[in-house]
């Protein structure tokens, strides 16, 4: 039976990533995310990070909600559920190790998948001559 492979980000385990400073972790990220972290976190992102740290300690028991879709998923966020705004509502997202280095907004889709109903009368040329029920 195959054992589940242990998660690694750029060769580092989750425990090693958790022990790194933000600057050390930023060096592992792709250029766009590295540049974003190098510029520093916005006040909204700092507030979100503060809430996440409190939730990890068990001192913040309300759902963590944010509009900050441009926040990069950091190793310390793993295991927490964050409600990310998609423009209409807050979508609950459980942070998994595989999400590290991505933006929160990538996981809360802003567009709904179109599910077409059955076509109405007059939708096609042949349906114009079908009797209406």
Swiss-Prot record:
The keyword Transferase does not apply. Gene3D superfamilies: 30s Ribosomal Protein S19, Chain A (3.30.860.10). Pfam families: Ribosomal_S19. GO terms for molecular function: rRNA binding; structural constituent of ribosome. GO terms for biological process: ribosomal small subunit assembly; translation. Keywords: Ribonucleoprotein, Ribosomal protein, RNA-binding, rRNA-binding. Disulfide bonds: none annotated. PANTHER family: RIBOSOMAL PROTEIN S19P FAMILY MEMBER, SMALL RIBOSOMAL SUBUNIT PROTEIN US19. NCBIfam families: PRK04038.1, uS19_arch. Protein S19 forms a complex with S13 that binds strongly to the 16S ribosomal RNA. This is Small ribosomal subunit protein uS19. The lineage of its organism: Archaea, Methanobacteriati, Methanobacteriota, Thermococci, Thermococcales.
């Amino acid at each position: 039976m195959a054992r589940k492979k242990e998660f690694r980000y750029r060769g580092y385990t989750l425990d090693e990533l958790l022990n790194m400073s933000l600057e050390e972790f930023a060096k592992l990220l792709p250029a766009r995310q590295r540049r974003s972290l190098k510029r520093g976190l916005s006040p909204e992102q700092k507030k979100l990070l503060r809430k996440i740290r409190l939730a990890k300690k068990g001192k913040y028991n309300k759902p963590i909600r944010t509009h900050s879709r441009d926040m990069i998923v950091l190793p310390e966020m793993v295991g927490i559920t964050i409600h990310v705004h998609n423009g209409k509502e807050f979508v609950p997202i459980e942070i998994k190790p595989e999400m590290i280095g991505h933006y929160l907004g990538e996981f809360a889709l802003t567009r709904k998948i179109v599910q077409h109903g059955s076509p109405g009368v007059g939708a096609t040329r042949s349906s114009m001559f079908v009797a209406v029920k």
